[in-house]
Amino acid sequence: MSSGVDRDTVISWSEQAQTTLQEAKKMCTRAQASLQSTTYQLVTQLPERLQFVTFMVDALKQQHELLTSIVESQSRIRKESVSQFNVQVERDLTPALAELDDILARLAKAKVPSYLINNVVHELEVHIDTLVEDRNLCDFISMDDIKLLTTNIEIYKANCTKLHGLLEKTMNESVIEPYQIIALKKYHNIMKQYKELMPVQLGMNLAPDVSPYKLNNLINTILKENSSLEHELVPMLEMMTNHYDQCVQGTLFFNTKNPKDPSGDVNFEVLRNDALELPDVLKELNTVYDIIVNNEVRTKKLLSSEFSRIDSLISMIKDLLEFYTDYKATHLSKYMILVLSCDEIFGKCSIAMNSNQTPLEAYIETITSLSYHYTQFLSIYKSEYLTELFYEQYTYPRKYLAKLTDFLNNDMFHLQQEEYERRKNWLARYGEFIPNEFKLPGELNQPSIIQVVTEGLDDVQKDYNDGKFNESAEEINLSDLIKTMKL
């Protein structure tokens, strides 16, 4: 049915439909490209960039944790080393040295009279105290060696104190300060920006099964709107295509006027209405296209800002990772080389020590052993040596001499007298019966003591007169010395 529509009108509609369809197709092509570009940027490009940022942040965290562990470990070791050294010095070494000084002072006060010395020859009693100047117990120990030992200890202690100070200063200046002022500060700044970038600004946590448009309102809005607009393009383009097809059928109708042609069923009234609506449809399509393009512009603007932040953050991370590498290669290496050099000095000792000992422990053990030895030396000198010397030099010799005198004057005398009487009686009884040519028993020499030779009794024998012992000046001096030591 032509419904009063002539051939020229249909041709005009057909030309209009063709032009509009061509323009719509171009517009849809551009719109589709814009949709794909926007979707790629939001769904693929942005997550990839954020994933790379997260990868870089994870690498930074790993390096930062490693560096923090090293710095904290070295700082703790340094503090423990200084503390242990100071504790050992204050708790063990200083008291040990004080104890040694005390016992040496006590040894210096313990006098040793000249008559106690082996190489002193006493020519006259009156000169006993003047032959050799009295000494003290310190004269009989190696004070030079002790002084050398204590001097070496003081040198070692001073060197260790200086080295600990140097290590602490180097630790603070070369390790801790660069770590805290540069590394830690930059790290916290990066993590702050990362947190602002991810959950606050973009609202994304990069979970593998979560798309970004589900997490961010703006991105979600753009993607949902584009999805809806894409669906609107299809029916509008289909309407224009269908309208153009109908116009072509209408043109064929007038050209052939074949009743059997299916175009004979063309509804020119509908065709007229579609032709009238076509500008509005094109306008609506153009509006949809403008929105799609505008969304692409909005997306580029959004991502331009975010990509700039992401690139800046990545650059900061790379710089900090590079600083970490340089920090470990220079600051930490310099400090560790110094530690090794100092440890070598810490391990040097002027005396022999066990493999499981430190020089400080060896010094403390040696000083303690010396103090114990000299304490025993002083104690034995006062309480044992002088008493034993007096006993062996005077008490026991007197006892021995008294026993010997008593034995000679009593037991031996009676024994000799009894033997003499026995022999005399025997000769009187039996001698006349023995020929003179025989040796008579009574004529044999009777055993007798002609001379008694003793040793070790000189100190008491010279003062033994008329069966009594007299105290010599030496004995009196030694006795007085013993009494003095017991006070």
Curated annotation (Swiss-Prot):
Q: Which GO terms describe its cellular component?
A: Atg1/ULK1 kinase complex; phagophore assembly site membrane
Q: How does it sit in the membrane?
A: Peripheral membrane protein
Q: Which cysteines are joined by disulfide bonds?
A: none
Q: Where in the cell is it found?
A: Cytoplasm; Preautophagosomal structure membrane
Q: Name one GO biological process term.
A: piecemeal microautophagy of the nucleus
Its main localization is cytoplasm
The record's InterPro entries line, in alphabetical order, gives: Atg17, ATG17-like_dom
TM ranges are none
One GO MF annotation is: protein kinase activator activity
Q: Which UniProt keywords apply?
A: Autophagy, Cytoplasm, Membrane
Name the PANTHER family on file.
AUTOPHAGY-RELATED PROTEIN 17
> What does this chain do?
Autophagy-specific protein that functions in response to autophagy-inducing signals as a scaffold to recruit other ATG proteins to organize pre-autophagosomal structure (PAS) formation. Modulates the timing and magnitude of the autophagy response, such as the size of the sequestering vesicles. Plays particularly a role in pexophagy and nucleophagy.
UniProt similarity note: Belongs to the ATG17 family.
Q: What is this protein called?
A: Autophagy-related protein 17
The gene is ATG17
